[in-house]
From Swiss-Prot:
Protein name: Meiotic coiled-coil protein 2
Lineage: Eukaryota, Fungi, Dikarya, Ascomycota, Taphrinomycotina
Region (Disordered): 1-29, 245-265, 284-309
MF terms (GO), sorted A to Z: mRNA 3'-UTR binding
Record PROSITE patterns: PUM, PUM_HD
Length: 703
């Protein structure tokens, strides 16, 4: 038990406080007599010091008052507990006397719950007791033996977070009437067996309550008090009346459980005693008791660590019955381990069986409604490994909901697998279902993939119908972020049964608009794809229009890639026309953010004579300025990369020409943020040239 210091504040402490107060008063008097000549600073300093002393003394007084209130409260609680202890001790003595003088009658035990403390902390008995049969072969033990065994049974248990804690711990008292010598509790087990059972559970710690040492101790109190468990907490409610529970012990063994209708919560009287099903055998040995209730025993103690009373009230008779069933079962029920973590694995193992048949529509609904990726993967695997008949059933279920699946994040993959594993009639049915929705599918981030897959698998008549529908909105779809990929797939498609010329129809639809398509982010990809996959006559009209508008296309963020493609892969007259267009605006293109990339591509991958032609254009001095365009390009944010490429990749004559012109403007280039890169490269090339010349001179002299 926690020791509590109940000493009141000593008179010496009070005397010291009074002396401090008198000392403070004297200081105030002295302060009042300060001469007028004393400085204001000294007076203020003394006032602050005095204020600090007064505050410290006031804190000491408050602390002593608080300690006094706490100790007074502890004294009142202990007095209440001691009075209740005396009442129960007197009751136990009267029970033992009654048992000793009248050993021939049947047993009737009345469980009385003494109310401890105020009404706020009152605890009521909340469990329906079961019929308890006592063994006839037991003999009356001595008072000493009962006390020893009861004290050994009444050990403490380490409290968990939800354990009952109370300094006013209620204990079921017992009033024994007409006790027989044959039906009394016996305690025959040894202390060693009990200790061995206790040591098996590390949660228990052992102590002997001071109540047990009383010579008037009643064994029934220990047994019943210990039948309080964490799992079966006895409940209370502030508004409930006092409850008295009458229990009669008999040798009968009822077979039907107690129904909620047999319990009256108002006075808690049992209407049908014969309906109690389970037994509480108070005469069980300590081994059985420790085995059957090791997880539910609670201490019978005055320890102050068990604070407050039980927390919640009783709401139904069913809850009362369940509490007593938990305590009275000889084999405590074991709560099955949760299988929630194993359910998904077991479920997927089951559904992965090769020929297992399920409601495919339910799984498809799960994909559409819940975006379930696992269901989509499962059906895709089924399409790969299942039998022919099962595949057809799955595909038929998918076709019935094909429109939402094609637009679904995970459902579109399932539809694509159906094009691979479905029969010809099913593929035709899926392709026909797409007609009338081509604009929506082609412009959808998931549907566009389904359309491309369908173009590879459907018959040409369905494919032609799809293309006809797309041509109705070619102005929108050919430059769309997703639909442009569908057009690229159409450009790559080979036609065998139908003499379809896609590019003729495309040129007719986009005549005069190719330069607009080429400068778009997605349209530029379409144009490049057409250059790679269409024959010369099909792409001629597009090429002519792009060369005519090459100035604007080369300066575009996306159009410059079209011109680069023509520079790298163009041939004959078309390439010559593109190079001439670039050289005519060489200076302007060299300092443009996007057109400079076209010039760089021409330096790296263009005709062999492009660098010489390019240098001729940028080294010609203008009439109004002595500084050559070469220096302006070398000092430009984008143009300096072009000069560096010429110094690194050009022919020796071309390199010498560039370096010769740059040396004349080294001061200007060194002062430029971007020109200094070119100046450094020129100096590096000069140093290497000097080293090589020295080596050559030495070699010649040696010879």
């Amino acid at each position: 038990m926690q020791s509590i210091d109940l000493r009141l504040p000593s008179t010496s402490a009070n005397h010291s406080i009074s002396e401090s107060l008198e000392h403070s008063k004297s200081e105030l008097n002295e302060l009042s007599n300060v001469s007028e000549s004393e400085s204001y600073f000294d007076i203020t300093k003394k006032l602050h010091a005095l204020s600090t002393v007064v505050q410290r003394q006031q804190r000491e007084i408050d602390n002593q008052k608080r300690d006094l209130c706490t100790k007074t409260k502890h004294i009142e609680e202990l007095q209440t507990l001691l009075s209740n202890a005396n009442i129960m001790s007197d009751g136990a003595s009267s029970q033992n006397d009654a048992f000793a003088h009248n050993p021939s009658t049947s047993v009737s035990v009345e469980l009385v719950r003494p109310v401890v403390g105020t009404k706020k902390h009152a605890v009521y008995a909340t469990s329906a007791p079961k019929s308890m049969s006592l063994q006839d072969s037991l003999s009356v033990p001595s008072a000493t033996a009962l006390a020893d065994v009861s004290s050994s049974l009444n050990y403490s248990r380490k409290l968990s977070s939800n354990s009952i804690k109370s300094t006013n711990a209620p204990v079921f008292g017992t009033a024994v009437k007409n006790v027989t010598g044959e039906n009394i509790l016996s305690a025959s087990s040894s202390e060693e067996n009990l200790n061995s059972n206790r040591n098996g559970d590390p949660k228990f710690r052992f102590s002997v309550s001071p109540w047990i040492s009383s010579s008037n101790f009643n064994p029934y109190e220990a047994s019943l008090a210990n039948f309080q468990s964490d799992n079966c907490k006895l409940k209370s409610h502030n508004s409930l009346p006092s409850i008295r529970t009458n229990v009669r012990y008999s040798n009968s063994k009822p077979s039907t459980p107690l129904s909620p209708e047999d319990v009256d919560l108002g006075t808690y009287t049992v209407k049908n005693r014969d309906s109690w099903s389970n037994e509480v055998n108070l005469s069980a040995s300590t081994n059985n008791l420790s085995t059957n209730t090791s997880g539910t025993l609670k201490p019978y103690s005055l320890s102050s660590s068990r604070s407050s009373s039980y927390s919640k009230g009783v709401n139904s008779a069913a809850s009362l019955q369940s509490i007593w069933e938990t305590m009275n079962n000889s084999n405590p029920s074991v709560i099955p381990e949760s299988t929630s973590s194993r359910e998904p694995a077991a479920r997927y193992r089951k559904i992965s069986e090769r020929n297992a048949v399920y409601d495919w529509n339910v799984i498809i609904d799960k994909i559409i409604v819940s975006n379930d990726q696992q269901s989509s993967i499962f059906l895709q695997q089924k399409l790969k490994i299942s039998s022919y008949d099962m595949k057809q059933n799955i595909v038929d279920s998918i076709i019935s909901q094909i429109h939402p699946l094609m637009l679904n994040r995970f459902g579109n993959f399932l539809v694509q697998r159906c094009f691979e594993h479905g029969t010809a009639p099913q593929i035709r049915q899926m392709g026909s279902a797409m007609l009338g929705n081509m604009l929506k599918l082609a412009t959808d981030p998931f549907g566009c993939h389904v359309v491309q897959k369908a173009i590879d698998n459907v018959t040409e008549d369905i494919k032609l119908a799809m293309m006809d529908e797309l041509f109705l909105t070619i102005d929108v779809t050919i430059m769309h972020h997703y639909a442009c990929h569908v057009w690229q797939k159409l450009f790559e498609t080979q036609w065998y049964e139908y003499p379809v010329n896609v590019m003729n129809r495309v040129n007719n639809a986009l005549r005069g608009k190719w330069h607009e398509v080429a400068v778009g982010e997605n349209g530029s990809l379409v144009v490049q794809n057409m250059f790679e996959n269409c024959v010369e006559k099909d792409k001629r009209e597009c090429i002519e229009e792009i060369i005519f508008h090459l100035d604007g296309i080369a300066r575009g963020q996306w159009g410059n890639w079209v011109v680069q493609h023509m520079v790298e892969n163009g041939q004959g007259e078309d390439l010559k026309r593109v190079i001439d267009a670039l050289l005519n605006r060489a200076v302007e293109f060299s300092i443009d953010q996007f057109a400079s990339k076209v010039i760089e591509k021409a330096i790296k991958s263009g005709p062999k004579n492009f660098i010489s032609l390019y240098l001729k254009q940028i080294t010609n001095a203008r009439v109004d300025r002595t500084r050559q365009p070469l220096i302006d390009i070398a000092s430009d944010q984008y143009g300096n990369y072009l000069i560096q490429q010429i110094i690194q990749l050009g022919q020796p004559a071309e390199k010498n020409l560039v370096i010769t012109h740059i040396k004349k403007h080294m001061v200007s280039l060194r002062g430029s943020k971007y020109g200094q890169k070119v100046a450094y490269l020129v100096e590096k090339w000069n140093s290497q040239k000097q080293v090589s010349s020295v080596i050559n001179y030495n070699c010649n002299t040696d010879l």
